[in-house]
Amino acid sequence: MPTTDHAPSARDKRVQLLHFLLPAHDWVPNHPRFPVLLYRQALAPSTPDLGTAFESRLNANGWPAQWRDGIFDYHHYHSTAHEALAVFQGRAELILGGPGGEVLAVETGDLLVLPAGTGHCLKSASEDFQVVGAYPQGQDWDICRSAPTAAQRAAIHAVPRPTQDPLDGSEGPLCALWRP
């Protein structure tokens, strides 16, 4: 079950961090070492132009923003990149870890960080739900919808640990929780 830490952010003491490891489940590999991170209220929902604010923060910390959209409503994972999903509008329930996995609610202002191999899927969402998707500098993402091949499993293990936390750079909790 998730572990909760308060105030992981050097910049905003209201942030609450949840972190948890997901074991391999069904056909989804998940990540063997790095936990999923959920920053509750990473940025205040009242922040003007929250999508742009998230993009600026992610870009500044070496996680270039790649797109704005919803989340796919089918189970998938990425074998070649870690992923940050910054909720700038609406709310949703996600399924993490694969079919029958953990249901996690996210809302405006939250930041979810998924290590390579972590299954995720949209279960339900408000009509206005939108996220910014970002990946560590130099990591190109793929979309995997079936059990990993030996090459994909090796790729997941080979994706390098980011040098910075997407929210707080070198001072952020990812740097401590994602140990090499």
Locate the predicted segments by residue:
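Double-stranded beta-helix
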Residues: P64, G70, Q89-R91, P99, K123-P180, ...
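Short, conserved beta-strand element in jelly-roll/cupin
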Residues: H78-I95, V113
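A generic structural motif
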Residues: I95-G97, K123
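Conserved metal-binding segment of the jelly-roll/cupin
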Residues: V106-S126, Y135
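A short, N-terminal "cap"/entry segment at the start of jelly-roll beta-barrel domains
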Residues: M1-H75, C175-P180
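A short beta-loop-beta micro-motif enriched in histidine and acidic residues
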Residues: G70-A84, P99-G100, E107
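Short, surface-exposed beta-strand-loop junctions and turns on beta-sheet-rich folds
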Residues: G100-E102, D128
